[in-house]
Amino acid sequence: MRRHLQWSIKQLTASYSDGQLSPRRVTEDALQDALRWKTLNAFVRLTPEQAGQQAQDAEQRYKLRQPISDLDGVTIAIKDNFCTKDVHTTCASRMLQDFVPPYDATVCSRLKQAGAVILGKTNMDQFAMGAGTVDSLYGPTKNIWSEDLNKDHWRIAGGSSGGSASAVAAGLCYAAIGSDTGGSTRNPASYCGVVGLKPTYGLVSRHGLIPLVNSMDVPGIFARSVSDCVAVLNTVAGPDKLDSTTIRQPFTRLHLPEVGQIDLSTVRIGIPKEYHCHGLSAEVLETWSKVADLLECSGASVRQVSLPNTAASIFVYTILNQCEVASNMARYDGIEYGHRATDERSTEQLYALSRAEGFNDVVKTRILTGNFLLLKKNYDHYFEKALRVRRLIAEDFARVFDSSAKEERVDILLTPTTLTEAPLYKDFASLTNRDQCAVQDFCTQPANMAGIPAVSIPIRLSQAGLPLSLQLMSNSLNEQLLLTVARWIEAQVEFDSLEHSQQYKASL
């Protein structure tokens, strides 16, 4: 066992400063472990030469006692839908299999400017359309908590950012970047027993993130602790002139209080009754209740609230998702860029065959459905109506967070992240992608619809020895309080993703 795997990012960089460890050694260990854990299929591409140079540069800065940030020399992985200069960015699809961007996504450039070591690109559902990381050109990603990684008893890692979650859970990197459109960071974080943060929409630049649903896409952060998530957020957040949707006001770095200094007496916690839904497992419900009791016993005000339009949220999300997908996928025509078919008898034939060969069935289905919903005869009935209901969903959150009646207002919402523990692949694959997303995204997509921040934190193990997590949501730009409460809960439950994971069931 590599002892530094149990350290936080702050402890790791302190060890660089005092000479206990070096960025090059940690990077070499990480690359070796990534190859040793190839069966997880967390990475689709490692970048050892680039990572080695970044680690060497960081090591030189520490020798000169001139580290440039809290992430200098820290190993990080990037989901394969973020553009990385001179490194393939494929969205796990044949359509972009040969695409090498000439520029970095803003998130990636800010990490590099901070001295982070980028290990490589992580697996995902094709074009981020999925909830299991099983619909990838490179094959499915496995969950390190699986009973057996080599037989039929392996568990999914969640999706669509399952590769990033799996890499962090296995100790292959200290943090990873994912994307979150309807829960694609929080869902795999829940299943893999790590922290997954979806920031406020517009807080982190989407420039260079290949779009799925422009109005909901948010870069997400994976780490093994809340404080590590904060370290990454402090690096990547803030206005970006290359993304007009970023919030213009300057970002104020977050500084979380020490656990012993956190006072919950003024914190109001809401329990949305609509999240007690069909399919919620008894163990998740018990976990939810116990954490609510823990918060109340520690001085927080806890009460039930109602978000009445939650029941419609998954349907509205599905409609809007498919409509925006149809629009975003139109650019992949085999002519301008992307996979190009060999049959060039006509422009129409080239266009049709390139898309037929370049997209999998999941992507094709969403494109077809989205175009159907956007037909003139359907536009008002589906798309326009979905937009109106989306506003009602956002107003539900605004009402509980901003209510003029003090007795009705709350600061934080506590809910499940996923309805169950990570399912077996064979059970997950028995349902269609559409049906799985309707189940897996139920608790997570409302935050994307409203644009508010949310974080998933692991709480305990199920009877089957698998992580169970809960989600916290708060008002827009209230990450400080959201992550403070998350840190307090984290300290009480003392969940350690590495201590219990498969990482220590095998010798490294």
UniProtKB/Swiss-Prot annotation:
InterPro entries: Amidase (IPR000120), Amidase_dom (IPR023631), AS_sf (IPR036928), GatA (IPR004412)
Cellular component terms (Gene Ontology): glutamyl-tRNA(Gln) amidotransferase complex; mitochondrion
Keywords, ordered alphabetically: ATP-binding, Ligase, Mitochondrion, Nucleotide-binding, Protein biosynthesis
MF terms (GO), sorted A to Z: ATP binding; glutaminyl-tRNA synthase (glutamine-hydrolyzing) activity; serine hydrolase activity
Catalyzed reactions per annotation: L-glutamyl-tRNA(Gln) + L-glutamine + ATP + H2O = L-glutaminyl-tRNA(Gln) + L-glutamate + ADP + phosphate + H(+)
Record: active site: 79, 160, 184
UniProt-listed Enzyme Commission number(s): 6.3.5.7
Pfam families: Amidase
First-tier enzyme category under EC: ligase
Name used for this protein in its record: Glutamyl-tRNA(Gln) amidotransferase subunit A, mitochondrial
Source species of the chain: Drosophila melanogaster
Gene: GatA
